[in-house]
Amino acid sequence: MLIQFSKMHGLGNDFVVVDGVTQKVFFNAETLKRLGDRHFGIGFDQLLLVEPPYDPDLDFHYRIFNADGSEVQQCGNGARCFARFVRLKGLTNKDRIAVSTVSGRIVLQLEDNDQVTVNMGVPEFEPAKIPFRALKAEKLYLLRVAEQTVMCGVVSMGNPHCVIEVPSVKDAPVETLGPKLESFDRFPERINVGFMEVVSASEINLRVYERGAGETLACGTGACAAVVVGIQQEKLKGRVKVNLPGGSLYISWNGPGSPVYMTGPAEHVFDGQIEL
Protein backbone atom coordinates (compact mmCIF):
# COMPACT_ATOMS: atom_id res chain seq x y z
CA MET A 1 0.00 0.00 0.00
CA LEU A 2 1.37 3.40 -1.03
CA ILE A 3 0.83 6.22 1.48
CA GLN A 4 1.45 9.96 1.20
CA PHE A 5 3.22 11.73 4.06
CA SER A 6 4.82 15.04 5.00
CA LYS A 7 8.08 15.55 6.87
CA MET A 8 7.84 18.41 9.38
CA HIS A 9 9.66 19.66 12.44
CA GLY A 10 9.16 21.89 15.45
CA LEU A 11 12.56 23.22 16.54
CA GLY A 12 14.29 20.14 15.16
CA ASN A 13 11.88 17.70 16.84
CA ASP A 14 11.02 15.91 13.59
CA PHE A 15 7.85 14.20 12.48
CA VAL A 16 6.33 12.18 9.72
CA VAL A 17 2.72 13.37 9.41
CA VAL A 18 0.13 11.16 7.73
CA ASP A 19 -3.37 12.08 6.59
CA GLY A 20 -5.67 9.32 7.84
CA VAL A 21 -8.77 11.26 6.79
CA THR A 22 -8.51 10.91 3.00
CA GLN A 23 -6.40 7.73 2.92
CA LYS A 24 -6.87 4.46 4.79
CA VAL A 25 -3.82 3.69 6.90
CA PHE A 26 -2.94 1.28 9.68
CA PHE A 27 0.38 1.16 11.51
CA ASN A 28 1.60 -1.71 13.65
CA ALA A 29 4.72 -1.56 15.83
CA GLU A 30 6.87 -3.37 13.26
CA THR A 31 5.92 -0.92 10.48
CA LEU A 32 6.51 2.08 12.76
CA LYS A 33 9.97 0.83 13.72
CA ARG A 34 10.85 0.34 10.04
CA LEU A 35 9.58 3.79 9.01
CA GLY A 36 11.28 5.42 12.00
CA ASP A 37 14.72 4.00 11.19
CA ARG A 38 16.91 6.87 9.98
CA HIS A 39 19.05 4.54 7.84
CA PHE A 40 16.50 2.11 6.39
CA GLY A 41 13.25 4.09 6.63
CA ILE A 42 12.24 7.76 6.66
CA GLY A 43 13.36 8.56 10.18
CA PHE A 44 11.44 10.56 12.79
CA ASP A 45 11.13 11.28 16.49
CA GLN A 46 7.37 10.68 16.23
CA LEU A 47 4.82 9.79 13.56
CA LEU A 48 1.64 11.90 13.75
CA LEU A 49 -1.60 10.47 12.42
CA VAL A 50 -4.53 12.74 11.51
CA GLU A 51 -7.84 10.91 11.97
CA PRO A 52 -11.48 11.99 11.60
CA PRO A 53 -12.98 13.35 14.85
CA TYR A 54 -14.57 10.97 17.34
CA ASP A 55 -16.79 13.83 18.54
CA PRO A 56 -18.86 16.16 16.28
CA ASP A 57 -17.72 19.17 18.35
CA LEU A 58 -14.09 18.52 17.36
CA ASP A 59 -12.21 18.89 14.09
CA PHE A 60 -9.81 15.92 14.21
CA HIS A 61 -8.38 13.13 16.34
CA TYR A 62 -4.61 13.32 16.88
CA ARG A 63 -2.50 10.17 17.43
CA ILE A 64 1.23 10.07 18.17
CA PHE A 65 3.63 7.15 17.77
CA ASN A 66 7.27 6.93 18.81
CA ALA A 67 9.95 5.48 16.55
CA ASP A 68 10.05 2.42 18.84
CA GLY A 69 6.44 1.62 17.87
CA SER A 70 4.79 2.77 21.12
CA GLU A 71 1.79 5.13 21.12
CA VAL A 72 2.00 8.17 23.41
CA GLN A 73 -0.62 10.50 24.84
CA GLN A 74 0.67 13.94 23.92
CA CYS A 75 3.34 15.83 21.96
CA GLY A 76 3.42 19.62 22.01
CA ASN A 77 5.83 20.17 19.11
CA GLY A 78 3.82 17.65 17.14
CA ALA A 79 0.59 19.51 17.91
CA ARG A 80 1.95 22.64 16.25
CA CYS A 81 2.98 20.66 13.17
CA PHE A 82 -0.41 18.92 13.19
CA ALA A 83 -2.14 22.32 12.99
CA ARG A 84 -0.02 23.51 10.06
CA PHE A 85 -0.40 20.18 8.25
CA VAL A 86 -4.20 20.13 8.26
CA ARG A 87 -4.24 23.68 6.87
CA LEU A 88 -1.54 23.04 4.26
CA LYS A 89 -3.35 19.92 3.04
CA GLY A 90 -6.74 21.63 2.88
CA LEU A 91 -8.31 19.40 5.52
CA THR A 92 -9.65 22.54 7.24
CA ASN A 93 -9.77 26.28 6.61
CA LYS A 94 -9.97 27.18 10.31
CA ASP A 95 -7.35 29.10 12.29
CA ARG A 96 -8.64 27.64 15.55
CA ILE A 97 -8.60 23.85 15.49
CA ALA A 98 -9.98 21.61 18.25
CA VAL A 99 -8.64 18.06 18.43
CA SER A 100 -8.86 15.06 20.71
CA THR A 101 -5.89 12.99 21.85
CA VAL A 102 -5.57 9.82 23.89
CA SER A 103 -5.31 12.02 27.00
CA GLY A 104 -8.01 14.61 26.28
CA ARG A 105 -8.75 17.68 24.15
CA ILE A 106 -6.44 20.47 23.01
CA VAL A 107 -7.01 23.64 20.98
CA LEU A 108 -4.53 24.80 18.32
CA GLN A 109 -4.40 28.43 17.13
CA LEU A 110 -2.57 29.28 13.90
CA GLU A 111 -0.72 32.60 14.24
CA ASP A 112 1.34 34.70 11.80
CA ASN A 113 4.86 33.75 10.63
CA ASP A 114 4.24 29.99 10.86
CA GLN A 115 3.79 30.21 14.64
CA VAL A 116 1.18 28.12 16.42
CA THR A 117 -0.21 28.59 19.93
CA VAL A 118 -1.44 25.46 21.64
CA ASN A 119 -3.74 25.29 24.65
CA MET A 120 -2.02 22.30 26.25
CA GLY A 121 -4.67 21.82 28.91
CA VAL A 122 -4.48 21.94 32.70
CA PRO A 123 -1.42 20.28 34.27
CA GLU A 124 -2.07 17.31 36.55
CA PHE A 125 -0.21 16.99 39.86
CA GLU A 126 -2.14 14.11 41.45
CA PRO A 127 0.36 11.21 41.59
CA ALA A 128 -2.13 8.48 40.66
CA LYS A 129 -3.16 10.40 37.53
CA ILE A 130 0.39 11.13 36.31
CA PRO A 131 1.01 8.13 37.06
CA PHE A 132 3.66 8.29 39.79
CA ARG A 133 3.94 6.22 42.96
CA ALA A 134 3.79 8.72 45.84
CA LEU A 135 1.63 9.13 48.95
CA LYS A 136 0.48 12.65 48.05
CA ALA A 137 1.13 15.55 45.68
CA GLU A 138 4.23 17.60 46.54
CA LYS A 139 6.01 20.52 44.89
CA LEU A 140 9.31 18.68 45.24
CA TYR A 141 10.06 14.96 45.54
CA LEU A 142 13.20 13.21 46.73
CA LEU A 143 14.00 10.09 44.68
CA ARG A 144 16.75 7.57 45.27
CA VAL A 145 17.85 6.47 41.80
CA ALA A 146 20.94 4.45 40.85
CA GLU A 147 22.62 5.18 44.19
CA GLN A 148 22.08 8.93 43.96
CA THR A 149 19.52 11.32 45.41
CA VAL A 150 17.46 13.33 42.92
CA MET A 151 15.23 16.30 43.79
CA CYS A 152 12.52 16.81 41.18
CA GLY A 153 9.05 18.08 40.35
CA VAL A 154 6.61 15.63 38.76
CA VAL A 155 3.64 16.62 36.59
CA SER A 156 1.54 15.35 33.70
CA MET A 157 0.95 17.49 30.61
CA GLY A 158 -1.09 14.68 29.08
CA ASN A 159 2.11 12.66 29.38
CA PRO A 160 4.27 12.25 32.50
CA HIS A 161 7.28 14.50 33.21
CA CYS A 162 9.97 14.62 35.87
CA VAL A 163 11.79 17.99 36.05
CA ILE A 164 15.19 18.42 37.68
CA GLU A 165 16.87 21.79 38.24
CA VAL A 166 20.56 21.80 37.28
CA PRO A 167 23.26 24.50 37.52
CA SER A 168 24.00 24.18 33.79
CA VAL A 169 22.27 22.21 31.03
CA LYS A 170 25.62 21.92 29.25
CA ASP A 171 26.92 19.64 32.01
CA ALA A 172 23.60 17.96 32.88
CA PRO A 173 23.69 14.12 33.09
CA VAL A 174 21.06 13.71 30.37
CA GLU A 175 22.46 10.54 28.80
CA THR A 176 23.25 8.81 32.10
CA LEU A 177 20.49 9.86 34.52
CA GLY A 178 17.81 10.29 31.83
CA PRO A 179 17.39 6.58 30.97
CA LYS A 180 17.65 5.55 34.64
CA LEU A 181 14.80 7.88 35.60
CA GLU A 182 12.78 7.02 32.48
CA SER A 183 12.48 3.41 33.65
CA PHE A 184 12.50 4.08 37.43
CA ASP A 185 9.96 1.82 39.17
CA ARG A 186 7.98 4.70 40.71
CA PHE A 187 6.95 5.70 37.17
CA PRO A 188 4.78 2.74 36.06
CA GLU A 189 4.35 4.06 32.49
CA ARG A 190 7.94 5.38 32.27
CA ILE A 191 8.58 9.12 32.17
CA ASN A 192 10.06 12.05 30.25
CA VAL A 193 12.93 13.73 32.08
CA GLY A 194 13.65 17.47 31.88
CA PHE A 195 16.93 19.08 32.98
CA MET A 196 16.20 22.77 33.67
CA GLU A 197 18.65 25.63 34.19
CA VAL A 198 16.94 28.78 35.52
CA VAL A 199 18.44 31.85 33.80
CA SER A 200 15.95 34.34 35.27
CA ALA A 201 12.31 34.42 36.40
CA SER A 202 11.29 34.67 32.73
CA GLU A 203 13.85 32.44 31.00
CA ILE A 204 15.20 28.89 31.29
CA ASN A 205 17.50 26.58 29.37
CA LEU A 206 16.21 23.03 28.99
CA ARG A 207 17.25 19.60 27.75
CA VAL A 208 14.75 16.73 27.68
CA TYR A 209 15.27 12.97 27.63
CA GLU A 210 12.06 11.71 26.06
CA ARG A 211 10.43 8.43 26.95
CA GLY A 212 10.88 6.03 24.02
CA ALA A 213 12.95 8.49 21.97
CA GLY A 214 15.98 9.58 24.03
CA GLU A 215 17.19 13.19 24.00
CA THR A 216 15.54 15.30 21.29
CA LEU A 217 16.28 18.80 20.03
CA ALA A 218 13.01 20.07 21.50
CA CYS A 219 10.08 18.79 23.56
CA GLY A 220 6.95 20.94 23.79
CA THR A 221 5.30 19.14 26.68
CA GLY A 222 8.70 19.06 28.40
CA ALA A 223 8.94 22.85 28.07
CA CYS A 224 5.44 23.21 29.53
CA ALA A 225 6.24 20.83 32.39
CA ALA A 226 9.46 22.65 33.25
CA VAL A 227 7.75 26.06 33.38
CA VAL A 228 4.85 24.70 35.43
CA VAL A 229 7.25 23.14 37.95
CA GLY A 230 9.34 26.33 38.03
CA ILE A 231 6.28 28.52 38.65
CA GLN A 232 4.96 26.10 41.26
CA GLN A 233 8.32 26.30 43.06
CA GLU A 234 8.26 30.15 42.75
CA LYS A 235 11.39 30.27 40.58
CA LEU A 236 9.57 31.45 37.44
CA LYS A 237 6.62 33.75 36.67
CA GLY A 238 4.63 35.18 33.76
CA ARG A 239 5.49 34.32 30.16
CA VAL A 240 8.67 32.25 30.13
CA LYS A 241 11.13 31.82 27.27
CA VAL A 242 12.36 28.22 27.08
CA ASN A 243 15.64 27.73 25.23
CA LEU A 244 16.00 24.19 23.88
CA PRO A 245 18.82 22.78 21.71
CA GLY A 246 16.62 23.28 18.62
CA GLY A 247 15.37 26.80 19.41
CA SER A 248 12.98 28.65 21.72
CA LEU A 249 9.36 28.29 22.84
CA TYR A 250 7.23 30.67 24.92
CA ILE A 251 5.17 29.16 27.73
CA SER A 252 2.47 30.83 29.87
CA TRP A 253 0.64 29.46 32.92
CA ASN A 254 -1.53 31.34 35.43
CA GLY A 255 -1.37 28.72 38.17
CA PRO A 256 -3.35 25.70 39.44
CA GLY A 257 -6.55 25.00 37.52
CA SER A 258 -5.42 27.09 34.53
CA PRO A 259 -4.36 25.74 31.13
CA VAL A 260 -0.80 26.03 29.84
CA TYR A 261 -0.24 27.92 26.57
CA MET A 262 2.70 27.17 24.31
CA THR A 263 3.73 29.27 21.29
CA GLY A 264 6.37 28.21 18.79
CA PRO A 265 7.17 27.45 15.14
CA ALA A 266 6.10 24.56 12.90
CA GLU A 267 8.04 23.94 9.69
CA HIS A 268 7.05 21.90 6.63
CA VAL A 269 10.16 20.26 5.10
CA PHE A 270 8.94 18.03 2.23
CA ASP A 271 6.20 15.71 1.01
CA GLY A 272 6.77 12.10 -0.01
CA GLN A 273 5.23 8.70 -0.50
CA ILE A 274 6.29 5.28 0.71
CA GLU A 275 5.18 1.68 0.28
CA LEU A 276 3.98 0.07 3.50
Curated annotation (Swiss-Prot):
Compartment(s): Cytoplasm
Enzyme class, UniProt record, top EC level: isomerase
Stored Pfam families: DAP_epimerase (PF01678)
Top-rank taxon, per record: Bacteria
EC number(s) reported in the record: 5.1.1.7
One Gene Ontology cellular component annotation held by this UniProt entry: cytosol
Site (Important for dimerization): 270
Pathway recorded for this protein: Amino-acid biosynthesis; L-lysine biosynthesis via DAP pathway; DL-2,6-diaminopimelate from LL-2,6-diaminopimelate: step 1/1
Active site per UniProt: 75, 219
Catalysed reaction equations from the record: (2S,6S)-2,6-diaminopimelate = meso-2,6-diaminopimelate
GO molecular function: diaminopimelate epimerase activity
Amino-acid positions noted as binding substrate in the UniProt annotation, renumbered to this chain: 13, 46, 66, 76-77, 159, 192, 210-211, 220-221
Record key words, sorted: Amino-acid biosynthesis, Cytoplasm, Isomerase, Lysine biosynthesis
Residues annotated as site: Could be important to modulate the pK values of the two catalytic cysteine residues: 161, 210
GO biological processes: lysine biosynthetic process via diaminopimelate
Database matches in InterPro entries: DAP_epimerase_AS, DAP_epimerase_DapF
Assembly: Homodimer.
Function, as annotated: Catalyzes the stereoinversion of LL-2,6-diaminopimelate (L,L-DAP) to meso-diaminopimelate (meso-DAP), a precursor of L-lysine and an essential component of the bacterial peptidoglycan.
Name of protein: Diaminopimelate epimerase
Organism of derivation: Tolumonas auensis (strain DSM 9187 / NBRC 110442 / TA 4)
